[in-house]
């Protein structure tokens, strides 16, 4: 741990401060800004020669600026002779562009970003709840994907809810929801089959499972515009659910997400701090945020000490 140093860009400095506080370290001294023409500029203001350096930087909105900050800072650290550079990317942007759909003339941007990260000399990536596990295969360097499930599960159990049914908001999330339900003493599982007529729009088609009188817990990796969760909450209430909660790792909350949530029948949306909340989101009474800092700090410590990450999750 004596060689460990942690730096951050402008994407999520508060999470970085929480992580270093738990590690008992100061945040690395770096200047990250822009030139007058909006190009990213980075200067490392202390000695990093021979150090094991971690950069905490989500690639959330503004995605391009935050990605370039990560890339440029990694280059600066390598040129300053850091022994190892690990990119800690709590929210990995561009992850939803992970395959070619509808047309052959589209990029696989998740692969492009993975190549950029590898090419700049980053040695390892540490991220949280990747949108698709197969993205790890896009990298030619080790990728550790840690999970927010222990944090979300602990919070749900502390709330003392009874008669819980875990709900997957779409067919693609069934594996995640089933795993969550299993950890809740094999809670009941329901599935919403939806069709998406166009990007960021969801239409409820069919509910599989009994939710009458239940506390329904929607589980997903992210909340973007909130359309899927709000439509799911409406369908669940129409089928007799007593209460509808949503637990999502990444609060993307783009577009009219806050307005959608405020106008929905969703009782509560619980998210983590992989992405900082806007003031509008902080003021929304239905949104509550938990911190991933304990899990992230332990993951950083384990990587630094060459210990198992999977052991954190009982594997």
UniProtKB/Swiss-Prot annotation:
Names of the cofactor(s): Mg(2+)
Stated name of the protein: Ribose-phosphate pyrophosphokinase
UniProt keyword terms in alphabetical order: ATP-binding, Cytoplasm, Kinase, Magnesium, Metal-binding, Nucleotide biosynthesis, Nucleotide-binding, Transferase
Gene3D superfamilies: 3.40.50.2020
Entry binding sites for Mg(2+) 2: 170
Protein family (similarity comment): Belongs to the ribose-phosphate pyrophosphokinase family. Class I subfamily.
Signal sequence bounds: none
UniProt cross-references to HAMAP family, sorted A to Z: RibP_PPkinase_B
Gene Ontology MF annotations: ATP binding; kinase activity; magnesium ion binding; ribose phosphate diphosphokinase activity
Annotated NCBIfam families: PRK01259.1, PRK04923.1, ribP_PPkin
Entry-linked SMART domains: Pribosyltran_N (SM01400)
Keyword Nucleotide-binding on entry: yes
UniProt lineage: Bacteria, Pseudomonadati, Pseudomonadota, Gammaproteobacteria, Oceanospirillales
Record field: transmembrane: none
Active-site residues, as the UniProt record annotates them: 194
Residues where D-ribose 5-phosphate binds: 196, 220, 224-228
Broad class of enzyme this protein falls into: transferase
One Pfam family from the record: Pribosyl_synth
Residue positions binding ATP: 37-39, 96-97
One of the GO biological process terms: 5-phosphoribose 1-diphosphate biosynthetic process
Catalytic activity: D-ribose 5-phosphate + ATP = 5-phospho-alpha-D-ribose 1-diphosphate + AMP + H(+)
Quaternary organization: Homohexamer.
Pathway annotation: Metabolic intermediate biosynthesis; 5-phospho-alpha-D-ribose 1-diphosphate biosynthesis; 5-phospho-alpha-D-ribose 1-diphosphate from D-ribose 5-phosphate (route I): step 1/1
PANTHER family given in the database record: RIBOSE-PHOSPHATE DIPHOSPHOKINASE FAMILY MEMBER, RIBOSE-PHOSPHATE PYROPHOSPHOKINASE 1, CHLOROPLASTIC
């Amino acid at each position: 741990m004596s060689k460990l140093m942690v730096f951050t860009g402008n994407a999520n400095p508060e999470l970085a401060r929480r992580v270093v506080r738990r590690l008992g370290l100061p945040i690395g001294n770096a200047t990250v800004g822009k030139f007058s023409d909006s190009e990213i500029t980075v200067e490392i203001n202390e000695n990093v020669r021979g150090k094991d350096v971690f950069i905490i930087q989500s690639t959330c909105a503004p995605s391009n600026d935050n990605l370039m900050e990560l890339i440029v800072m990694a280059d600066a650290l390598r040129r300053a002779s850091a022994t190892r550079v690990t990119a800690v990317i709590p929210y990995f942007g561009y992850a939803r562009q992970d395959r070619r759909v509808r047309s052959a003339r589209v990029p696989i941007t998740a692969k492009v970003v993975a190549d950029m990260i590898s090419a700049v000399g980053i040695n390892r990536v540490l991220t949280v709840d990747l949108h698709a596990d197969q993205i790890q295969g896009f990298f030619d360097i080790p990728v550790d994907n840690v999970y927010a499930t222990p944090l979300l599960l602990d919070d749900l159990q502390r709330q003392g809810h009874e008669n819980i049914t875990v709900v997957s908001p779409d067919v693609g999330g069934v594996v995640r929801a089933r795993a969550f339900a299993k950890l809740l003493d094999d809670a009941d599982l329901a599935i919403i089959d939806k069709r998406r007529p166009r990007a960021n729009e969801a239409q409820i088609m069919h509910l599989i499972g009994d939710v009458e009188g239940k506390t329904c817990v929607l589980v997903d990796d992210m909340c973007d515009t909130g359309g899927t969760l709000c439509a799911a909450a409406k369908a669940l209430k129409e089928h007799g659910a007593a209460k509808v909660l949503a637990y999502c790792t990444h609060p993307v909350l783009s577009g009219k997400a806050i307005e959608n949530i405020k106008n929905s029948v969703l009782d509560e949306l619980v998210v983590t701090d992989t992405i900082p909340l806007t003031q509008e989101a902080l003021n929304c009474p239905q949104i509550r945020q938990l911190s991933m800092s304990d899990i992230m700090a332990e993951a950083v410590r384990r990587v630094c000490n060459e210990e198992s990450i999977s052991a954190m999750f009982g594997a």
